[in-house]
Amino acid sequence: MGTTVLSLNDVSVRRGDRVILGPLNFSITQGERWVVLGPNGAGKSTLLQILATKMFPTQGVVKVLDKQMGMVDLFELRTRIGLCGSVIAEDIPFDETVKDVVLTAAYAILGRWNEDYDLWDESRAMALLTTFGVRELGDRIYGTLSEGEKKRVQISRALMTDPELLLLDEPAAGLDLGGREDLLRRFANFAADPAAPATILVT
């Protein structure tokens, strides 16, 4: 049996008298791939925010990478989680190069400042862009990309730190059928690697 990457025990979220999520009980082990399906308003985004350690539940215990929320430095923990979704996408600087959008994830920041990146960082960023078919866009300005190209860059960024848990929030939203199929095919090839992180895809 693999190492437990994530566990929720009697987790729920309330807004006033209304329960918007839960109660939930489940766990994910290393190497597993999960898909969370549901209509709008079902609580998928709330769940993802909890899993990404960006929201605390009203009740219950959440453990991420063997660390219990409320008893750990969340900033340090977040460096071990890859997140691709609208929360991150909205804050990516449009005037940044594609390569820098991916590279800055190594410091868990958005936007290039005065960080030093070594050859390993550069090589990993370009390898990820290659995996998702956008290597040739490395020097392009992020804001000039199509929606499909941006999605591929965002997934590459989420994987830059070699995370132990990968969270994808509707990664194919806004793409046409061909773009959706191509992105999911590339991700399926990546996820087939036994060394790929435990993954939750919300759609």
Give residue ranges: language-model regions.
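Catalytic Walker B motif of ABC-type/P-loop ATPase nucleotide-binding domains
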Residues: L166-E170
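Conserved catalytic motifs of ABC-family nucleotide-binding domains
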Residues: D162
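Conserved ABC ATPase signature
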Residues: D116, I141-L145
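Helix-to-loop junction immediately C-terminal to a conserved catalytic motif
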Residues: A52
